[in-house]
Amino acid sequence: MKLTNSWARLRRRRVIVDEKRCVECDFCKTVNVCRSPDQCIGCLSCFYACPYEARMIIEEEVEERLIKITVDGVEYNVPDGISVKEALQRIGVEFKPPGSRGLTAPCNLGGCWACAVLINGELERTCINPVRDGMKISLNIDEVEPLRIVHGPEPHRVGGKATPWFEVDGYGYVESAIWVAGCNLRCPQCQNYHVTYDNSGKPLTPREAAERLTECRSIYNTPGIAVSGGEPTLNRRWLIELFRNLREMNPKTRLHLDSNGTILTEDYVDELVEAGCNNIGVEPKAGRLDTYMTITGINDRSLAEKYFTNSWKILEYLVERYSDKVYIGAGFAYNSEWMSFEEVAEIGDKVAAIDPRLQVTVLDYFPTFRRRYIKRPSVDEMLKVKKILEERGLKTVIVQTRTGHIGPGNRSA
């Protein structure tokens, strides 16, 4: 970036609409909404969110006027036409690794609110909001309640990958669940993309979310409460406070976290358990890195390997450290588009080496979002997946099918 007294010349990314692909689905007007429609700031949220991939990134060299912002009482000159996050990075503010305590920016979609700071006195996201002349920013938000976009709650009859199968009968409700916005993965067949890419919903504090979940549990008399997404672990402070509130309001209820496991660390898991979470599901998704990259849409091989390795590693840590305190489950994403039966067997061997008693749930990924062309696996196909895993020694295998979930002994729910 070259600076003059009042202008900055910089190379920047901008997103434009590919009119040939746009079908006017209005996803960008109702769910993932631009916060700077008059001037693209290159946050890329709409690029990742468009179901029809009708967004293109172009790079250009531009001149932007310098504007003044105040951060923690100190005045800075930054280029106009960029996000608050980029402006903060340009003046040396550090965004910590995803899953850390403090300021992070793990989703870059506007859903998780982990990047939020006080902007002109209001808690707001830095990743999708444009920097403005005269903006006053405070990085000290320790006394401000965290926020996150939440969908639900709703009662569920089956639950998620770690919902104890012995509680599921297919008739009564087993969990009251919420789904939180934002994710660090870019799965082209995201099964909850309307949640994952939501940056326009009203955010809730942890206590507000806990109160709604507790009310839902009371109405439907569910033995469990679940938090899914999107990816719940992106906003650490919000999630820990949520579980603390839930445990306070529901002292005897099973509290279930459904996570992809990519950014969970041992100390993060310890903090979750201490906060009252006693049911954790981790989804390594695949047995091979190449398959994982296909499923998650993470094209950076080193980043994909980091996420993939961590999800398996944290599953091992959970089993080794908390088998007596936490009900643990593992999840995998099956579709013949990306996974062979040979890889299914490899997954079985890897899980068996950790603990053959570990509950394993295999989801039959269906066509949606950007992979509308794939075919949903048949019931027979999923039963074969189940048989392969059981032949590798696994004791509790559940497969999701179009007719319902099928578990040990081929009991359906």
Q: Where are the regions that the model predicts?
A:
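Glycine-rich phosphate/adenylate-binding loop and adjacent beta-alpha elements
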Residues: F47, T104-E143
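Immediate flanking context of iron-sulfur cluster ligation sites
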Residues: V15-I16, C40, Q89-L123, Y173, ...
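A cross-taxonomic marker for long C-terminal extensions/tails that follow the last structured domain
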Residues: M382-A413
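Flanking helices and flexible, charged tails adjoining ferredoxin-like Fe-S electron-transfer domains
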Residues: M1-R14, K20, G42-G92, P146-P153, ...
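Short glycine/threonine-rich loop-to-helix capping motif typified by GTGT followed
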Residues: M339-E343, Y373-P377, P408-A413
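Iron-sulfur cluster-binding cysteine motifs and their immediate structural context
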Residues: R14, R21-I41, S45-E61, A114-E124, ...
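Conserved AdoMet/S-adenosylmethionine-binding subsite of the radical SAM
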Residues: E208-R372
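N-terminal [4Fe-4S]-dependent radical SAM core
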Residues: K2-R14, V93, N129-W179, N192-Y197, ...
